[in-house]
């Protein structure tokens, strides 16, 4: 009798994705982040579901309902801390996953890559609306500042902003719809993740040398199930340590003050994982220009496969492109730092230079170095 996992219509899908999947034998630890993102999504869905059971999406009670969760609900403090810090780990994994894709040329799987960029946008949107829910000062003013950016849209801008607000300012209607979006979007993300995997399994995984690995493949289970399990343990230990020992380390102290439309916090800034994009937004002294740069900073990832000029797929054997890649990593770190700084003298110009460099690396330096390396290696 044939094995049930290979014949049952549902189990067969899981088997082909998690057990008998042929995987390149040489994929490194950098290939762990896909499954880690799946784990992050599962943690966020579970903790979020339990938080939603006790949270009230009303401006009169939202802040105190979060306090109630932390004080009175059994392990509510833990669920809330795991959820808030889980978002940070989600973004750490996403950025490492994207960095891996850029370094090893995984973007040559165009469908997988583009679904991935859409996933990034969905996760960013979910995190933004989620940050508004505790209804602290930074929640309120963050929502006000970021939704206000839509008023830069020509002709329909102001109407659009009022439509999203459900009134003439960020108010109860805004909070309730943001809660609805924050509940719904993770399920959309889960669906898009399946699409991401579907496209990936059409081609099979890339590998560190960027060559066709078909001659040397091994089953996903047991080799990579155990390798992923190690990653799960490390991620879970790190998340638990942060949530238990310093749960507020990455948060903003202003969010411990209930939202007050009459008092503006001295520095309005998003969570750390949006700071690089926020720095790019602020570096352009024009509202519409800033919004377009903000969008471009993410959507530029979709251009990467089109601008690939090298005959080599990965950067493993391309020293010039490696230097440019690590310059990009340093540049994003600088942008993250600048995004959290006040808008004053040295920071403004540093942010503008870093923003210009960010776009130049993608649009000019990567294609040029690929072309140059082809010439030097006689591959033209």
UniProtKB/Swiss-Prot annotation:
The chain crosses the membrane at residues 33-53, 77-98, 113-133, 178-198, 226-246, 288-308, 320-340, 347-367. A ubiquinone binds at residue 201. It comes from the Eukaryota. Binds 2 heme b groups non-covalently. InterPro entries: Cyt_b/b6_C (IPR005798), Cyt_b/b6_C_sf (IPR036150), Cyt_b/b6_N (IPR005797), Cytb/b6-like_sf (IPR027387), Cytochrome_b (IPR030689), Cytochrome_b_C_euk/bac (IPR048260), Cytochrome_b_N_euk/bac (IPR048259), Di-haem_cyt_TM (IPR016174). The keyword Lipid biosynthesis does not apply. Its cofactor is heme b. Gene3D superfamilies: Cytochrome Bc1 Complex, Chain C. Its main location: mitochondrion. GO terms for biological process: mitochondrial electron transport, ubiquinol to cytochrome c. It holds the Pfam family Cytochrom_B_C. It is a multi-pass membrane protein. The cytochrome bc1 complex contains 3 respiratory subunits (MT-CYB, CYC1 and UQCRFS1), 2 core proteins (UQCRC1 and UQCRC2) and probably 6 low-molecular weight proteins. PANTHER family: CYTOCHROME B. Heme 1 (or BL or b562) is low-potential and absorbs at about 562 nm, and heme 2 (or BH or b566) is high-potential and absorbs at about 566 nm. Belongs to the cytochrome b family. This is Cytochrome b. It comes from Apogon semilineatus. The lineage of its organism: Eukaryota, Metazoa, Chordata, Craniata, Vertebrata.
């Amino acid at each position: 009798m044939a094995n049930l996992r290979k014949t049952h219509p549902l189990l067969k899908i899981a088997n082909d994705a998690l057990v008998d999947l042929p995987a390149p034998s040489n994929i490194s630890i950098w290939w762990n982040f896909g499954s880690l993102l799946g784990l992050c999504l599962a943690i966020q869905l579970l903790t979020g579901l339990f938080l939603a059971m006790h949270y009230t999406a009303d401006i009169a009670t939202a802040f105190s309902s979060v306090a109630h969760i932390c004080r009175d609900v059994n392990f509510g403090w833990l669920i809330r801390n795991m959820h808030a810090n889980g978002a940070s780990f989600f973004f750490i994994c996403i950025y490492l996953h994207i960095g891996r894709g850029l370094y090893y040329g995984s973007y040559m799987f165009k469908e997988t890559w583009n679904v991935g960029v859409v996933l990034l946008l969905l996760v960013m949107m979910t995190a933004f609306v989620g940050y508004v829910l505790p209804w602290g000062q930074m929640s309120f003013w963050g929502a006000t500042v970021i939704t206000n950016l839509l008023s830069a849209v020509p002709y329909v801008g102001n109407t659009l902003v009022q439509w999203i607000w459900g009134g003439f300012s960020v108010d109860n209607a805004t909070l309730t719809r943001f809660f609805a979006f924050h509940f719904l979007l993770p399920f959309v993300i889960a669906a898009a993740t399946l699409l991401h995997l579907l496209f990936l399994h059409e081609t099979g995984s890339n590998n560190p040398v960027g060559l066709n690995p078909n001659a040397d493949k091994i089953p996903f289970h047991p080799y990579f199930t155990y390798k992923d399990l190690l990653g799960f343990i490390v991620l879970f230990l790190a998340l638990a340590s942060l949530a238990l020992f310093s749960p507020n380390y990455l948060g903003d102290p202003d969010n411990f003050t209930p939202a007050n439309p009459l008092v503006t916090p001295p520095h309005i800034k998003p969570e750390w994982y949006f700071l690089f994009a926020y720095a790019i937004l602020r570096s352009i002294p024009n509202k519409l220009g800033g919004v377009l740069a903000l969008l471009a900073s993410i959507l530029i990832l979709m251009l990467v496969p089109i601008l690939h000029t090298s005959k080599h797929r990965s950067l493993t054997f391309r020293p010039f492109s490696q230097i440019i890649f690590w310059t990009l990593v340093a540049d994003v770190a600088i942008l993250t730092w600048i995004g959290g700084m006040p808008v004053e003298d040295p920071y403004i110009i540093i942010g503008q230079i870093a923003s210009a460099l960010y776009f130049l690396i993608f649009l000019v330096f990567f294609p040029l170095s690929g072309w140059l390396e082809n010439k030097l290696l006689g591959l033209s």
